[in-house]
């Protein structure tokens, strides 16, 4: 028996007993029912009270009416009493009558701390209801009150347009969240909207259906910046919540890639890390030196991300905050974090000597006996010695990249001469300066 049924049954028993004892004085009962006499004659079409102050309606035949609407929408129950401040089930539908006996119609009403909606005929609304501003849901299984501040998995309203193909698994029900106003949480000015609920971010479409997987929240550049990933499996965390931390997944279909699974990193609001690509001074491109430091097991690692939102690996060209360009090394694809190795594998597969400063930036200039350009050691390639000009200074280096100081010898009688001073800079030699050896950068997948 439902809450309302128990109330109705109990009230009927009590009222029946009271009716038999309280109707006295001018009240008279015969085989047809109760009448009220004034000066010995019955009254018609009016209200009269008993000794308890309860109101009863006398119909056109003078007899007390029971279980019916009377007098401009008021209702009398099975004992004849006017219903006030309580629920009544009429023809299988629930109705509520106020202190005045008036029925609640065409509005919402807070009753015992809970909100209810009523149709214009006074019937309590159950299921989905649109009040002209937004959708609410009145849960018949919870007494018919409007849901507030809670999740509910439901079939959508008939007026909602659902793209069932957008869901990998669909049993006809979807998750909705109802705010403290009772309104369903939904996107209003875009296809999808991200909302924080209890400090956790979720995405909803224009119907209010919770989304999972990749969801495009906004149009922005780079494209990945407008996406979030909402957990589509409980193994990833709270189902439907914006993913936080590392994630291995296929990229959004809008983003061109090799089609392989990629790594992504999301902050505590679900925003993916991404990089900014800029033209470089050598006709190629570089990434802005905007790093992401991530701590794991008390160790902090430095990452740089592509415009597609993937951590870079290998040798990468970056633009520093001062506008200059240089190289950085982020290890193997399995590492994909800043490394300070010296003998590294370049993008073309060649092993080469590199030099990096304490921040991981490739050195340009002389350092520790070697000459570097964007971190790459400059060395003689076609000869044992070569001149290279870096930062306006021309140095003499051997085929190991080491700066040769105080050198003053001819290669052979009558051939080109190499000569350097105490700093290893060119000092009168006649050999031509070689073209700088450029780093071979890793192409990011």
Language model region names:
Residues 2-445:
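Extracellular adhesion/carbohydrate-binding repeat motifs centered on closely spaced tryptophans
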């Amino acid at each position: 028996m439902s809450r309302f049924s128990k109330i109705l049954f109990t009230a009927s028993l009590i009222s029946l007993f009271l009716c038999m004892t309280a109707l006295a004085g001018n009240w008279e009962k015969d085989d047809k029912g109760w009448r009220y006499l004034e000066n010995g004659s019955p009254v018609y079409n009016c209200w009269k009270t008993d000794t308890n102050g309860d109101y009863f309606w006398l119909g056109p035949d003078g007899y007390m009416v029971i279980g019916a609407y009377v007098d401009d929408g008021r209702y009398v129950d099975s004992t004849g009493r006017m219903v006030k401040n309580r629920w009544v089930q009429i023809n299988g539908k629930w109705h509520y009558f106020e202190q005045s006996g008036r029925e609640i119609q065409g509005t919402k009403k807070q009753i015992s701390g809970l909100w209810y909606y009523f149709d214009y005929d006074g019937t309590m609304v159950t299921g989905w209801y649109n009040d002209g501003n937004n959708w609410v849901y009145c849960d018949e299984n919870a007494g018919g009150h409007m849901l507030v501040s809670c999740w509910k998995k439901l079939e959508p309203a008939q007026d909602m347009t659902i793209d069932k193909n957008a869901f990998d698994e669909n049993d006809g029900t979807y998750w909705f969240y109802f705010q403290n106003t009772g309104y369903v949480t939904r996107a209003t000015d875009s296809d999808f909207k991200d909302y924080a609920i209890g400090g956790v971010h979720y995405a909803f479409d224009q119907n209010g259906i919770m989304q999972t997987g990749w969801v495009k929240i906004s149009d922005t550049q780079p494209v990945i910046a407008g996406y979030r990933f909402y957990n589509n499996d409980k193994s990833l965390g709270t189902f439907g919540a914006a993913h936080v931390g590392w994630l291995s997944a296929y990229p959004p279909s809008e983003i061109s890639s090799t089609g392989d699974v990629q790594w992504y990193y999301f902050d505590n609001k679900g925003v993916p890390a991404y990089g900014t690509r800029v033209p470089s001074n050598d006709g190629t491109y570089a990434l802005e030196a905007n790093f992401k430091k991530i701590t794991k097991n008390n160790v902090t690692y430095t990452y740089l991300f592509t415009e597609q939102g993937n951590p870079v690996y290998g040798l990468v060209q970056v633009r520093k905050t001062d506008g200059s360009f240089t190289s950085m090394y982020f290890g193997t694809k399995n590492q994909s974090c800043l490394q300070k190795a010296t003998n590294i594998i370049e993008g073309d597969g060649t092993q080469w000597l590199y030099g990096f400063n304490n921040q991981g930036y490739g050195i340009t200039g002389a350092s520790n006996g070697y000459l570097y350009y964007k971190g790459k050691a400059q060395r003689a390639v076609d000869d044992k010695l070569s001149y290279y000009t870096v930062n306006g200074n021309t140095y003499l280096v051997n085929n190991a990249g080491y700066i040769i100081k105080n050198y003053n010898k001819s290669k052979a009688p009558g051939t080109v001469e190499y000569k350097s001073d105490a700093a290893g800079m060119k000092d009168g030699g006649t050999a031509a300066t070689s073209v700088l050896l450029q780093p071979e950068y890793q192409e990011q997948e």
